[in-house]
UniProtKB/Swiss-Prot annotation:
This is Nuclear speckle splicing regulatory protein 1. Residues 107-171 are annotated as: Necessary for alternative splicing activity. GO terms for cellular component: nuclear speck; nucleus; ribonucleoprotein complex. The gene is NSRP1. GO terms for molecular function: mRNA binding. GO terms for biological process: developmental process; mRNA processing; regulation of alternative mRNA splicing, via spliceosome; RNA splicing. The modification Phosphothreonine is found at T276. Belongs to the NSRP1 family. Its main location: nucleus. Residues 204-219, 251-274, 314-343, 351-488, 502-521 have a biased composition (Basic and acidic residues). There is a cross-link at K211, K282 (Glycyl lysine isopeptide (Lys-Gly) (interchain with G-Cter in SUMO2)).
């Protein structure tokens, strides 16, 4: 069943009933007169007026209802203006554009003023020089000075005085221009005497001090009316610092806002504690200035010893004076400890950051090296797969090259060992005392061999050997004569350069003779004698040494 009151299908809106009835057009063939037309037009205008009045009443009623609910319904302009103001306040760019001040123009204006003053000074100097050049030509004339010029001169004098004071103050305040600690001690002395105001302490510490005094129940307790409120204390410290800017110039400057707040607190605390100090110092200073200082001192000691109550009062005063100093020391130590903690924390953070960054860099480099290594291996494998024969050939060439290098290194090592061995043998023979005896023995052995070979050789070779023997005998005679002349000098490493040169020449000659003998003598002749064998080895070493000494250049040793 269909639910009653519910429609289904296409729902079309019903046309609203027309307020004004539709007037039928008069027919063309009707008998309507002009009077009927007038009546219809009047009725239509009346109906329209009535509809307008009804709509006006309705709108007035609605306006009254809306105003009763909210009085600011129709204040469009004011609400829009407020919205625009809020937008402008929330937008910092617009605020910066409005309140923006010139950045550089004031500095430029100052520079212009300074240049003007310098120009005026230059002109005055120029006029002064011209007057000096005139040499009193116009001294009898009257000099007229205007009031404006007098005013300018006065302003210039005042400005010069200001500059001089500013320079002196800067020199006093500048730490780099201080020659000694006289300024620091001067401030301390003035503060102790009372000529300068001591920097005030903080209100918080003053309040804690008042609480401690209340708990102890001192008789000289400060009344609530005489207590300094924090705003007045802060104002007072600001005024005092402005009046005496040099009073606290040698102390440390606070680097952060917290330290500045703590400094203000310490100043307020110091003011309260040192008021009693200044009064006490004045009390002790005044009797010293008076003529009857000794009598007053005696009177003071009598008054001091009159009653135990006054003694207790003075003790409390001393404690009260010492307490600010102790608290000030504790404040400074706390501040230093806080600074150290802050610095250590910063250092720890920076070291942790550096270590983290280093670790990250190492991991990145390691990863990059691994990637490059993997890429190289992958390329190598691809090349092997593509060109296996080429890879084998390259491997074979590399092995041959390595083997050749190893052989070359072995040869170089052997040649070096030989040279070292030759040098060692030469030094040993030069240092030994039996060097010349052994040479004589070698010469005798060689002569015996030569005689033996001469029998076998041809007559031409015999003539040559005879000539060589004569030369050898003459040289031996010369050597014996030298030995007889210098019998005390042994043949050691300290022999003269001439003797060394002679020995090298003999070695060269012996080498030449050996070559000649080898040409003549049969190479395959047996030598069973041990002396002949040792002499041959010695001859070989002598030949090597002769070659080394004959070289005019130094061979480069291969690495």
């Amino acid at each position: 069943m269909a639910i009653p009151g519910r429609q289904y299908g296409l729902i079309l809106p019903k046309k609203a009933q027309q307020l004004h009835p539709v007037l039928q057009k008069p027919s063309v063939f009707g008998n309507d007169s002009d009077d009927d037309d007038d009546e219809t037009s009047v009725s239509e205008s009346l109906q329209r007026e009535a509809a307008k009045k009804q709509a006006m009443k309705q709108t007035k009623l609605e306006i009254q209802k809306a105003l009763a609910e909210d009085s600011t319904v129709y204040e469009y302009d004011s609400i829009y203006d407020e919205m625009q103001k809020k937008k402008e306040e929330s937008n910092p760019k617009l605020l910066l554009g409005k309140d923006r001040k010139p950045k550089y123009i004031h500095n430029l204006l100052k520079a212009v003023e300074i240049r003007k003053k310098e120009q005026e000074k230059r002109m005055e100097k120029k006029i002064q020089r011209e007057r000096e050049m005139e040499k009193g030509e116009f001294d009898d004339k009257e000099a007229f000075v205007t009031s404006a010029y007098k005013k300018k001169l006065q302003e210039r004098a005042e400005e010069e005085e200001r500059e001089r004071r500013a320079a002196a103050l800067e020199a006093r305040l500048d730490v780099t221009k201080q020659r000694d600690l006289s300024g620091f001690y001067r401030h301390l002395l003035n503060q102790a005497v009372g000529e300068e105001e001591v920097p005030t302490c903080s209100f918080r510490e003053a309040r804690s001090e008042i609480k401690e005094e209340k708990s102890k129940g001192y008789s000289d307790e400060v009344s609530s009316e005489s207590r300094i409120p924090p705003e007045n204390c802060i104002r007072q410290t600001g005024v005092k610092v402005e009046e005496n800017p040099d009073a606290d110039s040698d102390f440390d400057a606070k680097s952060s806002e917290n330290d500045e707040m703590e400094g203000d607190k310490g100043n307020c605390r110091r003011e309260k504690g040192t008021e009693t100090l200044s009064s006490h110092s004045k009390h002790h200073r005044n009797p010293a200035r008076s003529p009857s200082s000794s009598e007053e001192r005696e009177h003071g000691t009598q008054c001091h010893t009159k009653s135990s109550r006054s003694r207790g009062h003075e003790k409390r005063e001393d404690e009260h004076q010492e307490r600010p100093a102790r608290e000030q020391d504790s404040y400074h130590t706390d501040r230093d400890s806080r600074k150290e903690k802050r610095d250590s924390h910063r250092h720890r953070e920076s070291s942790h950051r550096d270590s983290h960054w280093k670790r990250h860099e190492e991991e990145r480099l390691r990863g990059r090296d691994e990637r490059e290594r993997n890429d190289r291996e992958w390329k190598r494998e691809k090349d092997r797969e593509k060109y296996p024969s080429r890879e084998q050939e390259r491997h074979r060439q590399r092995n041959n090259y390595d083997r050749h290098n190893e052989k070359g290194c072995e040869k170089e090592e052997k040649s070096k060992e030989k040279e070292e061995h030759v040098k060692a043998r030469k030094e040993r023979y030069e240092n030994s005392d039996k060097y010349r005896d052994r040479e004589k023995r070698e010469v005798s052995v060689e002569s015996s061999e030569r005689n033996r070979d001469r029998k076998e050789s041809s007559p031409n070779s015999r003539a040559k050997d005879r000539f060589v023997n004569q030369e050898r005998a003459s040289k031996m005679r010369d050597m014996e004569k030298d030995k007889e002349r210098n019998p005390e000098k042994p043949s050691s490493s300290e022999a003269s350069l001439g003797a060394k040169h002679r020995i090298t020449e003999e070695c060269q000659e012996t080498g030449k003779e050996q070559e000649r003998l080898h040409e003549t003598v049969n190479k395959f002749a047996k030598r069973s004698n041990e002396e002949t064998v040792t002499s041959a080895r010695d001859r070989y070493l002598a030949r090597q040494m002769a070659r080394i000494n004959a070289k005019t250049y130094i061979e480069k040793e291969d690495d």
